[in-house]
């Protein structure tokens, strides 16, 4: 009996001591690349700022963000469809006030320049399901898609699903720490669409950055807390802007506004990166 008790104690002690070959989960963001996922001109920017700048055109940009984490690649938003690159006059909207989009560089070509194959990317997340953000989701048919359930369930044109039913998906209901180490957090920011989301990324040298998605479209709207006319819920939009403002303060973070050309002109684009 004494031998049995002694053996049990020995096994308990050995089990309580971390083993030398036990590998902790890898953590931390290593790099963030800003990819050119579209450029265009809005016919009338009052579409995004009701009652302000009526009749004025404005240059827009569209960004995707490739995040290299210790556990693998994450792509945030997929931009205008790569097929638009072959359209000499760009993709013209039905509404002349909206954006005529061009695709100077395909997403596939920019990934190739970095030596990244679409199959290397195991996770993608989209801010929302407007076409300028989900245009290339099916370049990554096996990647886990992170999207809010409210967005996934939101009917598309003619009640069509917004994603292929066979695409692997994680339907979120609120914020999500993607890698479990606090370095990449999806923030639920509904309003522009029912399940809109933004992304908080913590970089070792650059510090914290919030990727807005379309919670805000350009700096003037952010400064004046304006909700666009193309919007699901104004009160939710304003509440989400406040959530982002609180996050910026708490994390001492920068706000990178997806469609703001003036801001993007001052940022490094791929193949340069932030770390």
Task: Indicate residue ranges for each PLM-predicted region.
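Short Gly/Pro-enriched turn/cap motifs at secondary-structure boundaries
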Residues: 54-58, 187-192
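Metallo-beta-lactamase
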Residues: 18-132, 144-188, 206-213, 233-254
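Active-site metal-binding loops of divalent metal-dependent hydrolases
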Residues: 37-38, 78-81, 129, 150-151, ...
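Cap/insert and terminal regions of metallo-dependent hydrolase folds
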Residues: 82, 95-109, 200, 205-275
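Bacterial N-terminal signal peptides
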Residues: 6-16
